[in-house]
Amino acid sequence: MRLNELTLQHYRNYETVSLDFPKTLNLFLGENAQGKTNLLESIYVLAMTRSHRTSNEKELIGWEQAAAKISGVVEKKTGTVPLEILISNKGRKTKVNHIEQKRLSAYIGQLNVILFAPEDLSLVKGSPQVRRKFIDMELGQVSPIYLYDLVQYQSVLKQRNQYLKQLAEKKQTDTVYLDILTEQLAEFGGKVLYARLGFLKKLEHWANLLHQKISHGRETLTIDYASSIPIDNTDLSLEALQNQLLQQLMNNRKRELFKANTFLGPHRDDLLFIVNGQNVQTYGSQGQQRTTALSIKLAEIDLMHSETGEYPVLLLDDVMSELDNERQIHLLETIEGKVQTFLTTTSLDHIKDKLTVEPDIFYVQQGKIERNSAT
């Protein structure tokens, strides 16, 4: 999978920009606050429909403009696919092959991307919310069914919490409707949990291979799923997970009615990264934490390829400066030649000697971009 063309109109500090990307490695060079990250963000938004940096979509629209538009041409094994997303105060509109898409699950997955930014190093030591978002975004790209189930789960969860609040405030007394919402939550929650467990097993395989390589065989990485409900590892069938979640929700109802909140389910779960038998978040060194984060992010490349038959597009936002020399080499060895990569940096000095393929270099200054292929 490749992004062959990208056009921005009134996106952040870009008035109008049109670029083509014939090469596998694309470097965006410039000082800070010139628009490098905005460019990578636009590719991410084109793929995922949302920014990874802000939930306020107005920030994506250029100053005194009514809307921003991102369009691109994606090349797959099956042919080229034009994509477009229009962002305005009225919301977002997405198009595939010039046809508007009504459902998110019909759009996401047309362009698969992996973003690696300095903040992704907090994947290991950050909050559980960071890790839940990670698995939801990555799994959602390769499985439209998961994305649908997740959206349904979140919708029912919101309704259930609202109804719990109404019951707590005595505005409602009918618990039959709560039973219905609880059954729906267990149905979709079980599906989300089932998909996550399967995905993590595959991710662990690829991540451990990379982690052992980076650590020269000294460390083994495993990933544990920390569920908010007890899980019987002898029966991880969809039906068993749904029944267990339903039973735990029913058992916890008194507390939920008192607190007017849902305390159990995939929205409360977490991931644990275990290196040589110890939780790296708690006991790992900074080096181990960074190796783990790098292994997890790079593992997504092979995992997405195995799931979709296509390599994703890799977005590296000023991450090279956060990695030591050895980890930089492992990263570049993993991606070069097989993964189209967009990399931002303020200087080429620390990476130019490690490159084995000739990149396209784009100079970014105040929302203007100039190409120069010479290194």
Curated annotation (Swiss-Prot):
PANTHER family, sorted: DNA REPLICATION AND REPAIR PROTEIN RECF (PTHR32182:SF0)
Organism: Enterococcus faecalis (strain ATCC 700802 / V583)
Name by which UniProt lists this protein: DNA replication and repair protein RecF
GO annotation, cellular component aspect: cytoplasm
Ligand binding (ATP): G30, E31, N32, A33, Q34, G35, K36, T37
Keyword Cytoplasm in annotation: yes
SUPFAM superfamilies, alphabetized: P-loop containing nucleoside triphosphate hydrolases
InterPro entries, per database record: DNA-binding_RecF, DNA-binding_RecF_CS, P-loop_NTPase, RecF/RecN/SMC_N, RecF_2
Predominant location: cytoplasm
Domain of life: Bacteria
Keywords for this protein: ATP-binding, Cytoplasm, DNA damage, DNA repair, DNA replication, DNA-binding, Nucleotide-binding, SOS response
Record-level Gene Ontology MF annotations: ATP binding; single-stranded DNA binding
Localization terms from the record: Cytoplasm
NCBIfam families found in the cross-reference section: recf
Family: Belongs to the RecF family.
Cystine pairs: none
CDD domains: ABC_RecF
Biological process, per Gene Ontology: DNA replication; DNA synthesis involved in DNA repair; double-strand break repair; SOS response
Function: The RecF protein is involved in DNA metabolism; it is required for DNA replication and normal SOS inducibility. RecF binds preferentially to single-stranded, linear DNA. It also seems to bind ATP.
Keyword tRNA processing among record annotations: no
